């Protein structure tokens, strides 16, 4: 067998392995949050980026073996940004045989009129886009709206709110839309961005650049993203542990009087969630919570997360 054939077999093996992991992650998120139910019509929001392409591909894959029947309709919003390649998504979706709708709205013109040159346009653009997508979901009879945010997006939002907003608030895997009419789901909630990047490269999705509008990136989010990438590289398992923490919240050991009745504690109260452990040295597991080392991660024991002294 030639060297090229050996490489091809190895690449295919790695792709299959990666797809299985993404499929498992998406399947677990769907089950944990009851994202998809019998007869659902899922509107898959397709931007032309790696995340939404991956979401559509994995949902199509799961559709073949899911215990419930559901349909997919891909929707792209053409915001009339200069240089937007209008042919790419229709051609791609036609070849897949996926039902789709391209919505044309000149939100770019509205944003450029309202926002001064050089300022970030993302906030206004996002609000306009959200309203259009809600309207489109109603027109298409969609029961769920699927967005392509992944685990790293959720963690970034948590830290953004803590560092700059003074609140512990992330990005929910499932929620009721702003207009109170639509259920929004994030099937990639358990997926790592680096897995999505590798999958996207291997599948050679026709990526459409996200900065055609010329808007400046959100600098705060970029700082948080760089911080998380640095932690993931230097302390394997830290990202997984932090995401596990978001699923293991103990309100009685925080300080939000709206989540726990601190005023109601008296001499007749029971011990709640282990009482006061502030002065006890907890037993810290060697392996960070939620982390499973993988063959291709090349993670070293000496780089494991030191939970006692977080750097």
UniProtKB/Swiss-Prot annotation:
- Per the entry, which co-factors are needed? Mg(2+); [4Fe-4S] cluster
Q: Which Pfam families match?
A: ATP_bind_3 (PF01171)
InterPro entries with a match to the protein in the record? Rossmann-like_a/b/a_fold (IPR014729), TilS/TtcA_N (IPR011063), tRNA_Cyd_32_2_STrfase (IPR012089)
Q: What is its EC number?
A: 2.8.1.-
Task: Please name the GO terms of the biological process aspect recorded for this protein, alphabetically.
Answer: tRNA thio-modification
**Keyword check for Cytoplasm:** yes
Leading EC class: transferase
Q: How is the cofactor bound?
A: Binds 1 [4Fe-4S] cluster per subunit. The cluster is chelated by three Cys residues, the fourth Fe has a free coordination site that may bind a sulfur atom transferred from the persulfide of IscS.
**Keywords, A to Z?**
4Fe-4S, ATP-binding, Cytoplasm, Iron, Iron-sulfur, Magnesium, Metal-binding, Nucleotide-binding, RNA-binding, Transferase, tRNA processing, tRNA-binding
Q: Where does it localize?
A: Cytoplasm
Enumerate the CDD domains for this protein: TtcA-like (cd24138)
The reactions it catalyses are: cytidine(32) in tRNA + S-sulfanyl-L-cysteinyl-[cysteine desulfurase] + AH2 + ATP = 2-thiocytidine(32) in tRNA + L-cysteinyl-[cysteine desulfurase] + A + AMP + diphosphate + H(+)
GO MF assignments: 4 iron, 4 sulfur cluster binding; ATP binding; magnesium ion binding; sulfurtransferase activity; tRNA binding
Q: Which GO terms describe its cellular component?
A: cytoplasm
Residue ranges annotated as motif PP-loop motif: 47-52
Pathway info = tRNA modification
Q: Where does [4Fe-4S] cluster bind?
A: 122, 125, 213
Domain of life, per lineage: Bacteria
Checking NCBIfam families in the record gives: PRK10696.1 (NF007972)
Physiological role = Catalyzes the ATP-dependent 2-thiolation of cytidine in position 32 of tRNA, to form 2-thiocytidine (s(2)C32). The sulfur atoms are provided by the cysteine/cysteine desulfurase (IscS) system.
PANTHER family, per database record: AMINOTRAN_5 DOMAIN-CONTAINING PROTEIN, SULFURTRANSFERASE-RELATED
Task: Family membership, please give it.
Answer: Belongs to the TtcA family.
Q: What else is known?
A: The thiolation reaction likely consists of two steps: a first activation step by ATP to form an adenylated intermediate of the target base of tRNA, and a second nucleophilic substitution step of the sulfur (S) atom supplied by the hydrosulfide attached to the Fe-S cluster.
| Subunit-level organization | Homodimer.
This chain belongs to the protein called tRNA-cytidine(32) 2-sulfurtransferase
């Amino acid at each position: 067998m030639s060297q090229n054939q050996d490489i091809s077999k190895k690449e295919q093996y790695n792709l299959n392995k990666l797809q299985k992991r993404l499929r498992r992650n998406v399947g677990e998120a769907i089950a944990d949050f009851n994202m998809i139910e019998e007869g659902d019509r899922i509107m898959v929001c397709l931007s032309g980026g790696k995340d939404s392409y991956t979401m559509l591909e994995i949902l199509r894959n799961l559709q073949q073996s899911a215990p419930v029947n559901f349909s997919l309709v891909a929707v792209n919003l053409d915001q009339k940004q200069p240089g937007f390649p209008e042919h790419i998504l229709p051609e791609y979706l036609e070849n897949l045989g996926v039902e789709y709708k391209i919505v044309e709205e000149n939100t770019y013109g509205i944003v450029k009129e309202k926002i001064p040159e050089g300022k970030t346009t993302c906030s206004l653009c996002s609000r306009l886009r959200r309203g259009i997508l809600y309207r489109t979901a109603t027109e298409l009879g969609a029961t769920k709206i699927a967005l392509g945010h992944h685990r790293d997006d959720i963690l970034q939002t948590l830290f953004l709110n803590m560092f700059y907003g003074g609140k512990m608030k992330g990005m929910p895997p499932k929620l009721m839309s702003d207009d109170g009419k639509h259920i929004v789901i994030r099937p990639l909630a358990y997926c790592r961005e680096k897995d999505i990047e590798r999958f996207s490269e291997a599948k050679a999705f026709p990526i459409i650049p996200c900065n055609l509008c010329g808007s400046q990136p959100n600098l705060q989010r970029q700082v948080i993203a760089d911080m998380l990438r640095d932690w993931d590289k230097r302390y394997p398992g830290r990202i997984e542990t932090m995401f596990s923490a978001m699923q293991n919240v103990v309100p009685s050991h925080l300080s939000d009087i709206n989540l726990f009745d601190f005023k109601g504690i008296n001499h007749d109260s029971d011990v709640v969630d282990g009482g006061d452990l502030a002065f006890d040295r907890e037993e810290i597991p060697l392996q960070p919570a939620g982390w499973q080392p993988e063959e291709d991660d090349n993670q070293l024991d000496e780089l494991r997360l030191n939970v006692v002294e977080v750097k």
